[in-house]
UniProtKB/Swiss-Prot annotation:
It is found in: Virion membrane; Host cell membrane; Host endosome membrane; Host Golgi apparatus membrane. This is Envelope glycoprotein B. The lineage of its organism: Viruses, Duplodnaviria, Heunggongvirae, Peploviricota, Herviviricetes. Keywords: Disulfide bond, Glycoprotein, Host cell membrane, Host endosome, Host Golgi apparatus, Host membrane, Host-virus interaction, Membrane, Signal, Transmembrane, Transmembrane helix, Viral attachment to host cell, Viral envelope protein, Virion, Virus entry into host cell. It comes from Human herpesvirus 7 (strain JI) (HHV-7). It holds the Pfam family Glycoprot_B_PH1. A motif (Internalization motif) lies at residues 814-817. The chain crosses the membrane at residues 684-704.
Length: 822
């Protein structure tokens, strides 16, 4: 029995599973409204609708006034003025003279302030003196002269080639003087250079110092005149003032240039420089405000505690206080005549026929230190126009001239009234929006009693579960199930004992589902609205005949006829009822905001007293001038020359004398060595040296071989004629003796006889022994024989020698005779 029951159960389960797979419909899920279970948990949040909302009514209290607006800004540019400096540059140069070269060893430069009397001479004559007094101490004072001439001359100023836009320098000595001392001696030369610089100085409020474009500074106000209270921190005994001072404007044309007369001139000695500048009146030469812009058509809006000045051209507003600003400081006096003339000009050209001045001009100051000059205006026909706009709206005939006069006023009035109307309309819209929200909250509160979950989900914008608990709502979050596990049943009829009940049907379709984080166990529920899963299957109704129902699930619409699934279609195929009222509002056009450049780049660059760019340009130009001068002085100096000079200078007077002696010696040796090396470096000298070296090597080899032969055969080497026959030697000797009238030396007695002069061949090779006297006589005879043979060879060479071209031309017409004819 057990086996039979088990087999029947398995068979029934398989049939049920096959039938189940066929009775299910797979549902698509919706990301916005997923399948979920919305049941109230134990711990929930309590919420309520707040209906006590108060809406404040809108009322505009802004008053606008039209007028003319002039804006002044603080002048940040530094005050610039001309400064002229004077100095004398004393240069001591030590040189060492070599053969063809003068070496520059050391250079001592001392800069001294130019004497004030000489400054006046420069300003009027464009020249300075060639001497300068140098104080080493209170008791010692030396006078140096240019080129060591010991004569006080005048030197003309010449412009320096290196210049910039802000600096112009004049000098008297382009190249330092160099003394060419004795050869291989050290010498020292003196040069004096007068340097006058025309440059630009800058000072900034409160004008307690000024800086030159060369980088130098003066700690004092340029407006200090000796008696006023301006700041001046330099020693007052170093400054001098001259009234009605006449001077050359520039030194380009020398003393023939243009002269200018200045009211007051200041001369300050600071360090090694004399500074001079014109003392001006600060009140008349300085203006701390600068005109920025003028707005002929501007509006002023009055708020509770401030004024807003609006300019349509600038797309900006300037905020000020309501109290007028008084320009009591003397630094503002410079703009009084300026803004009054601008106001009068604009009024006469643009508003004279249509507006009247509504009182005098007013002055305000913004938080950004801008000064606003405001001239309020009032339209002459504004009152008439207001009465006209409130009168009857019927058409009236008007003359053409009247229409032209009224059009401009109407447009201006329309602009002002439209602004008020728009602001009022926006305020009313805000008030109406507030009232509408209040009423909507009341409606939602009442609807929450019918469908609390739907209302709460609409408010929060996501699926929520809600339940009315008395006067408040209990809210909880829905639990999402496994979206792929949801299966919709195809039949909505109740089953009773494995057969359908014909009287009862489900009001909502059945479905099975499982949770995401649980086992594969499935649960039974019913499909609710918006993909909500209703727990249980107790929602039934009496079955109706010819019934058609459509249920939405995910993105599909499932169609049931007579409580049985027929097919599915997309939700988008069902036309939606458009119950949403669109609010069509065109956005405002883009406003092109004008960039307000309060200070230009040029003004910002001029705001600083120290101009780094100008200082660096001046430094580089002066450096270039010094480099040009140094290249004219000397070539590269060997390091050992400067070292020797420094060493012997340290030994005092004895060292200087010893250094002079050693300098001469070392210089001579150095020149010889340098000459040899220079000759070897030359291509011709190098090639000649190689050839001479090869010749010397060949000569050594030749002498070595000759010495070797001499050691082996001395007779053949010393007396080469011994290898010849006796008769040829005797004939050559006798012919030479016959031609010589006076013998060079007396012959031995045994050579004067015929018997002795004609030796036999056997006697030459005789081997008898001789005495020392006979041997000496034989050596002398050999000597005479050698000399005779050599003379015979010379005579033979002359005999065969042809006359040269010069001899043939000189002795033309003559015939050469042979020696036998003589």
């Amino acid at each position: 029995m057990k086996i039979l029951f088990l087999s029947v159960f398995i068979t029934f389960s398989l049939q049920l599973s096959l039938q189940t797979e066929a009775d299910f419909v797979m549902t698509g899920h919706n990301q916005h409204l997923p399948f979920r279970i919305c049941s109230i948990a134990t711990g929930t949040d309590l919420v309520r609708f707040d209906r006590e909302v108060s809406c404040a009514s809108y009322g505009s209290n802004i008053k606008t006034t039209e007028g003319i607006l002039i804006i002044y800004k603080t002048k940040i540019e530094a005050h610039t003025f001309s400064v002229r400096t004077f100095k004398k540059e004393l240069t001591f140069q030590t040189t060492y003279r070599d053969v063809g070269t003068v070496y520059f060893l050391d250079r001592t430069v001392t800069t001294l302030p130019m004497p004030i009397e000489e400054v006046h001479m420069v300003n009027t004559e464009a020249r300075c003196l060639s001497s300068i007094s140098v104080k080493r101490s209170e008791e010692e004072e030396y006078v140096a002269y240019h080129k060591d001439e010991y004569v006080n001359k005048t030197l003309d100023l010449i412009p320096l080639n290196f210049k910039s836009d802000t600096v112009r320098r004049y000098i008297t000595t382009k190249e330092p003087f160099l003394r060419n001392g004795p050869l291989w001696f050290y010498s020292t030369s003196t040069s004096i250079n007068c340097i006058v610089t025309d440059c630009i100085a800058k000072t900034k409020y409160p004008f307690d110092f000024f800086a030159l474009s060369t980088g130098e500074t003066v700690e004092g106000s340029p407006f200090y005149n000796g008696i006023n209270s301006k700041t001046f921190n330099e020693p007052t005994e170093k400054i001098l003032f001259r009234n009605n001072y006449t001077m050359l404007k520039t030194f380009d044309d020398g003393s023939k240039g243009n002269f200018v007369t200045l009211t007051k001139m200041a001369f300050l000695e600071k360090g090694n420089t004399i500074f001079s500048w014109e003392v001006q009146n600060e009140e008349s030469s300085i203006c701390l405000l600068k005109h920025w812009m003028t707005i002929p058509h501007a509006l002023r809006a009055e708020n509770a505690n401030s004024f807003h000045f609006i300019a349509q051209e600038l797309t900006a507003s300037f905020v000020t206080g309501k109290s007028n600003y008084t320009l009591s400081d003397s630094k503002y006096n410079c703009i009084n005549s300026n803004y009054t003339s601008i106001l009068d000009e604009i009024y006469q050209t643009q508003y004279n026929n249509s507006h009247d001045k509504n009182g005098s001009y007013e002055i305000f100051k913004t938080e950004g230190d801008l000064i606003l000059i405001w001239q309020p205006l009032i339209q002459r026909k504004l009152t008439v126009l207001e009465n006209f706009s409130n009168a009857s709206r019927k058409r009236r005939k008007r003359e053409l001239e009247t229409n032209k006069d009224i059009v401009y006023v109407q447009l201006q009035y329309l602009y002002d009234t439209l602004k008020d109307y728009i602001n009022t309309a926006l305020g009313k819209l805000a008030e109406a929006w507030c009232l509408n929200q209040k009423r909507t909250i009341t409606v939602l509160h009442e609807l929450s009693k019918i469908s609390p979950s739907g209302i709460i989900s609409a408010v929060y914008g996501k699926p929520m579960s809600a339940k009315l608990i008395g006067d408040v709502l209990a809210v909880s979050k829905c639990i999402e199930v496994n979206q792929t596990s949801v299966q919709l049943h195809k039949s909505m009829r109740l089953t009773k004992d494995s057969s359908y009940d014909a009287l009862r049907c489900y009001s909502r379709p059945l479905l099975t589902y499982s949770f995401a984080n649980s086992s594969k166990e499935t649960y039974l529920g019913q499909l609710g609205l918006d993909n909500e899963i209703l727990l249980g299957n107790h929602r039934t109704e009496e079955c109706e005949q010819s019934n058609t129902k459509i249920f939405l699930s995910g993105k599909f619409a499932h169609i049931f006829k007579d409580y049985t699934y027929v097919n599915s279609s997309l939700i988008t195929e069902i036309e939606a009822l458009d119950a949403f009222v669109d609010l069509n509002i065109d956005p405002l056009e883009n406003a092109d905001f004008t960039l307000l450049e309060l200070y230009t780049k040029d003004e910002l660059s001029k705001a600083n007293v120290f101009d780094l760019e100008t200082i660096l340009r001046e430094y580089n130009s002066y450096k270039s001038a010094l480099h040009h001068i140094e290249t004219k002085i000397a070539t590269v100096t060997p390091t050992y020359i400067g070292g020797i000079d420094t060493f012997f200078k340290g030994l005092g007077a004895l060292g200087l004398g010893l250094g002079a002696v050693l300098g001469v010696t070392a210089g001579a040796l150095g020149d010889v060595v340098n000459g040899v090396f220079s000759f070897l470096k030359n291509p011709f000298g190098g090639a000649l040296t190689i050839l001479l070296t090869l010749g010397v090597i060949g000569l050594v080899i030749f002498l070595f071989l000759r010495h070797k032969r001499l050691a082996q055969t001395p007779i053949d080497i010393l007396f080469p004629y011994t290898s010849k026959s006796t008769n040829s030697v005797l004939q050559a000797t006798q012919s030479v003796q016959a031609q010589v009238k006076e013998p060079l030396d007396s012959s031995p007695p045994y050579l004067k006889t015929n018997k002795d002069t004609e030796p036999q061949g056997d006697d030459i090779t005789h081997t008898n022994e001789y005495s020392q006297v006979e041997a000496l006589k034989m050596l002398k005879a050999i000597k005479l024989l050698d000399e005779s043979y050599k003379k015979a060879e010379i005579a033979e060479a002359k005999k065969s020698q042809r006359p040269s071209l010069l001899e043939r031309i000189q002795y033309r017409g003559y015939q050469k005779l042979s020696t036998e004819e003589l």
